[in-house]
Amino acid sequence: MLCLTGYVFVYTSGRADNPIRSDGFSYYVYLPSWFLFHDTTLSSVARDCCGGVYPAYTAIIRWPTTRRWVNAHPIGVAVMQAPSFAVAHGLTRWTNLSPDGFTLYYQHAAGLSGLFWVIAGLMVLSRLLRRHFADPIVAATLGAILLGTNLFHYATFDSSYSHAYSFFLFAAFLDLTERWYGGPRVRTSVLLGIVAGLIALVRHPNVVFLIVFPLYGVERADLLRSRVALLWDHRRLVTIALAVAAFVIAPQLAFYYQATGRILVSSYGDLGFNFTTPRILGVLFSVQKGLFFWSPILLTSCAGLAWLLRSRHSARAFVPPALVFLVLDTYIIASWWDWQFGGSFGHRGFVDTLPIFAIGTAAFFERVSRQPVTRRVVGVIVFLVIALNLFQMLQYWNHVLPFSDTTWEQYRRVFLQWH
């Protein structure tokens, strides 16, 4: 209800334009093109909605050799939006509105779809955490992750972006990985393949998250050999998961081939990564979208993961893949040409990884809950950090905080100012 209330507030108070905007437009555009215009080339939407040429902000470009449209944003979000799109289309036809893919019902179907997947992600994450932590710890962790980071923003204000969907998929992949190692089955393998394929289909760089599966529970280097042996013993199930993932990814490769004549392309054109000069400190600590500057609550996760690494806790199995993934993911994000990821509240590149951070935060809360004085002090600090995060989120919604390239001077000038 809190997320839904936030969504309604955003779109009834004039805080945001239509949900399908900016990156959200590019992720969504496949649906009207495919199902309303029966066009897999994206040309019809360009002609009917954009005057024949997609605006530069969409990152939908003409491929130099074929002159066909190539969308930098893959089809995964559209696939996960398809059920809500079908409902919106039915309501649009029933109420005699224009079935062009961008009228009222389509707009809010796309927005509410993102909200739905965030809620679903929280439910899956809750189930995962309850296998390792007491209910009060789980409730506190989910509250901290939802309200103390930019997750609430991407569940409401910018819910048509990919991050809401990746949040769910990451939580589901963690849950399924643990269930698979608890008892490998065909059903779990199929679900792992579907989720793995969607992770790659929603945002290609997130494929690195799949490293969680082979490294789960590998707490020492000498265990790698036994892990390889285990996966080989269950090679039929691993093959099933890989085959399902390949089937899920295949439509994207077909789209690339149709548009460019290749199955693998750099859809951002000349834009890309600067792997030799990553902005790691900026990505983590700067006022320009630094992860821990804008979401200091996540420092609890760092402390919790460090404690888990030295403990015999049942959640320790997640720590090795979590640490490897977080290092790789931070390096990839910091190497992107626009390491701030454009206009956003906080660093949106890390919203996808919040299920990993949630495990560390839960461990931290469990640890401090054993000492009454420490628990009260931490509780006050967490409350204040969440309050600051929500206030700054509202500042962003009110256009008080800059969308990007925030400087210390700007931040100090508007700190705790409502308008």
Give names to the regions the model predicted.
Residues L31, L142-G143, T188-R203, L210-P214, ...:
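Membrane-interface alpha helices of multi-pass inner-membrane proteins
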Residues L36-L112, W337-D338:
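Interfacial juxtamembrane loops and adjacent helix segments
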Residues R93-G101, A120-T149, F168, G182-L192, ...:
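Transmembrane-helix signature of polytopic, membrane-embedded enzymes
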Residues P99-G121, V138, L142-A172, L176, ...:
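Aromatic- and kink-enriched transmembrane "portal" helix at the membrane-lumen/periplasm boundary
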Residues R131, R185, A221-I240, A303-V324, ...:
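Membrane-interface helix-loop-helix junctions at transmembrane boundaries of multi-pass membrane enzymes
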Residues Y165-A196, V212-F213, I356-G360:
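Specific aromatic-rich, kink-prone transmembrane helix
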Residues V212, R220, R235-G304, P321-S335, ...:
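Membrane-lumen/periplasm interface segments of specific transmembrane helices
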